[in-house]
Structures are given as C-alpha cells and as structure tokens.
Amino acid sequence: MHTQQLISQIESQYLKDNLPEICVGDTVKVGVLIQEEDNKNSGEKERIQFYEGVVISLSKLKNINGTIRVRRILQGIGIERTFLVHSPLIKSINIIRRSKVRRAKLYYLRTLTGKATRLKQRLIKHYRLIY
C-alpha cells in the first residue's frame, strides 16, 4: 500500500459524517468544548461555548484539515475565528440562516460596517414526500 493511501485510510477514521451542508454566507452556530480549571475541586470542568456568525470562507471540508472561518461583530469590533470542522472539540454545527452570495470568499465584509454587512436571505423550499 502506498503511503498516501495509508494516510487517507487512517484519516478517514476520524472524519465526522454528520456534518450539515455548510456554504459560504450561512449564519452558523458552532458549539466548542471548553475545558476550564476548577480551583475549588482541583479538577477540570468542561462546558460547551457557542459561537455564532457568518461563514466567510470554507476550505476542504471533506478532508481531515477542513476549516470554516466564521465572522461576527461584538461591541462594534469584528472577530473572526477559524474552526477545524473534524476536530473532537467541535461538538455541534447548526445552520441558522442561509444567505445568497456571489463570491467564494466573503473577505470584503471586513471593510463594511453596519447595515452594509447584511446578506440577502436565500429561501429554501421544503418538499414533503407522500408515500
């Protein structure tokens, strides 16, 4: 077996298979596992912290190194955070809203402020199957 095939076989064990179909422009809510030190019980405490924002870039989601970059505005300051999608520290990714965009990367949102950063909502038709 070649080394590349061996590497891809090992990496496939760690890929998450329950990821939603994420697109650039989506507003997502990412649940990240945070480990805190507890001074009273001298142990570690775990909790899930949610980070909500607009996906401005995607990179290789089918790969073990797949990332999403999420941007949000907090107290007038833009904050971007990059998440490894297949990391065990990512507990959940929920899509809140889908937006219609015409670019693969939304880096131009960095220069915009206020209402100019709004994206047009994309309507999704839900079909009901009748058997």
UniProtKB/Swiss-Prot annotation:
The gene is rpl19. Keywords: Cyanelle, Plastid, Ribonucleoprotein, Ribosomal protein. It comes from Cyanophora paradoxa. GO terms for cellular component: cyanelle; mitochondrial large ribosomal subunit. Signal peptide: none annotated. It is found in: Plastid, Cyanelle. GO terms for molecular function: structural constituent of ribosome. This is Large ribosomal subunit protein bL19c. The lineage of its organism: Eukaryota, Glaucocystophyceae, Cyanophoraceae, Cyanophora. Its main location: plastid.
